[in-house]
Structure formats: C-alpha cells, structure tokens
Amino acid sequence: MFEMYVDVDGKRLRCGYTTGSCSAGAAKAATIILFNKEKNLNEIEIATPKGIDVTMPIELIEKFDDYVECTILKDGGDDPDNTHGIEIKAMVKKIKPIDNKIFQDEDLQKFDSVLVEDSRAEKEDELERVVLKGGTGVGIVTREGLFIPKGQAAINPVPRKMIKEEVLKVLPPGERVEVIISVPQGEKVAKKTFNPRLGIVGGISILGTTGIVYPMSEDALKASIKIEITQKAINNERLVLTFGNLGDNYCKELGFKEEEVVTCSNFIGFALETCVSCKVKSIIIVGHIGKMSKIAYGCFNTHSKVNGVRLEVIALELALLGYDMSLVKRVLEEKTCEGAVKMLGDGYDKLYENIGNKIVQKIKEHVYGELEVDAVMYYGASNPILLWKSIKDN
C-alpha cells in the first residue's frame, strides 16, 4: 500500500497514484519481463513529475511468445475516485527497429512542446523507440479543445511522457517496442466521469500531471472544470453553469443541451473566471436557493466550510421589503433554505426577484461586467422559484 499522507481539515488522509502512474509502471514492468522472461516481479518503482518515487504492487504478469502483459490496480488512496481499484494493463511487444527518421507514433508530432525541451533531436530519436497506443477501455477524443487532438486515445501529455520515459529506462539498446494501454472496466467506469460531457467515448482518460492523487484535491476538480469550459466554449458563446447532479438534471428539464451545461461544484467563482478567459459571452446560472443565496451575499465558493450564510439572505430581503419581524425570525429559525421556502409558501415573487437581482449584480461585479448573466433558482428537486429573463422569454 502506498504510504504517503496529507492533512486535510485536521484529518490524516492517504494519497494514491494516478492512472498515468499505473500505466507507466505497468509498461515498465512488462518491458523488463519481455527482455528477461525468466525474471519475476512483485512490484515496480517509477519516478513521478512531482519528484516522488512511487513503488506499486504488480497484480498480474502474463508472458506470451512475443509480448508481455502487466496489470496494476489503481490506488486512489483516500480520494473518492471512481477509478479506484480498477485494472490498468500494459501490453508490450517488440517491433522492428527503424533506421530512418520516420515518426510512427503520432503523438510525437503533436506533443513536441510537451515531450521535448532540450536536446530535441536526441530525445525524439529516443522517444520514437516507444510507440504508444490506447487499447480497450481507454477513451477516444471526438471533439476539439482538449489536450489531445481529435481522434486520438485519451492518454494525456504528461502520462504519455511518463510511460515513454519509464520504458526507455529499461529498454535494451537498439530495441523498439509497442505499448498498448488498456482498462478492462474503462467503458463502464467512464460513465461516472466527466468524459461523456467532454466528448471522450469508449473509456476513461489516462490522467495525472503530478503522478500522485491527493485526497479531496480542489486543484484536480478545478482542472476538470477548466477543461470542460474550455472545450464547450469552442462552439458556445453562452454556457449554463450549475452546481451538481440536481442542477444538471433540472437543466435537462429546462431543455438545455448537454454541450452547453457545465457542472462547477462549489467553485462558481473559478468557473466564472474561466468563462471570461475562454471568451464566453454570457452565462445562465442554475441552482438551488441554498447555493444561490450565498452568491447574492458575494460568496463565490459555496462550500459550507467557506460560508454558511443562506437563511440570512432570505431574512434580510424580507426585512428590506418591510415584512414583519416575526416572519423574519421564523425564517432564521428554519434549518434550511428549503424549509424556509416551504414555510413561506406562495406570494413571495418579489423576494426571489430581489435575490435574483443581487445574484446577477454580484456575478457581474466579480467578472467586471465581462459576462451577460441570467439566473434560474429552484428548491426541492426541480421546483422553480425564479425563472430569470431569457428563460421566461423562451
């Protein structure tokens, strides 16, 4: 078991390693056995871009006449990761060495800037000794705007580099190999990832910029949000931002297309800033009143540990509208915004309109007026209490 820990909110959590690290380790181990059939391996060590060496247990090695397959189980540590425990396989076989300089691995042409920094020609000569491909359960990119060109296997640039470099460490001089990365459960697991939204079909992506999985990593989630916005902004001047599964489902009810909806979790501020940098013209934000009320207060990270203000926004707006203080106090006594809305009942359209106005105002202030903003607010699973501007006009 990988023994690296971090403290998150006072809890000691175990780190894991990425699908990219698993792929690099499996490919390295398979290469060693391919050229040393009598050798047995129980574990394999690789270097990660983070500068930390990782030793991974080998689940299975299968030896065949002209190739070797190695399986490593993904270890996500204490991170709630859909890929935790799945098999990552690398099949390595010898292929004919080439004398003339012909690029047979398409990614060498596409990723020169990532793979080669110094001594470019020398490194290209070395890297073309490892031909890398995606196999079963590794997704195929079908849209523009991602790190990988359309039509190629979804093995991101850093894992590609890791796989090649680890194989080259153990590849005998003059030899050349083909490496095929596969994930037997990849197509099934991919349905629980961002891949379908990004136009990556048939499997998961081989990911990782550091090689290490950090538990509850905000950076990893923000990276996913940025990728989705960047990709969807190519064909959409307007995007629809929502917070999670409930909002995502409600967007479908409202008739928004999957190609324009982005789930941004609690990181609405980051998502808005990314929209601006990607030249998005307008956004519609769709959310539960509990999350949306925080934005009206000027909070752009809506996680409860960052800001617990919700009922106070409803209470303040009621007071500003001149409602009796007994009603204001009743709102503050509720446990949730959901409860407050149900307690109030019908007849408070002006209240929700005022909250909506403040949401739009705060967002425009946050992005310095660089986005047109509409808002949709609901309670329960999909009960609308504010259908704003363009939604009402449709």
From Swiss-Prot:
Tell me which family the UniProt entry assigns to this protein. Answer: Belongs to the CbiD family.
Question: Which gene is the coding source of this polypeptide chain?
Answer: cbiD
Its GO biological process annotations read: anaerobic cobalamin biosynthetic process; methylation
Task: List its EC numbers.
Answer: 2.1.1.195
Q: Which organism is it from?
A: Clostridium beijerinckii (strain ATCC 51743 / NCIMB 8052)
InterPro entries tied to this protein: CbiD, CbiD_sf
Q: In which pathway does it act?
A: Cofactor biosynthesis; adenosylcobalamin biosynthesis; cob(II)yrinate a,c-diamide from sirohydrochlorin (anaerobic route): step 6/10
Q: Report if keyword Methyltransferase is assigned.
A: yes
Q: Which residues form the signal peptide?
A: none
- NCBIfam families per UniProt: cbiD
Q: What is the name attached to this protein's record?
A: Cobalt-precorrin-5B C(1)-methyltransferase
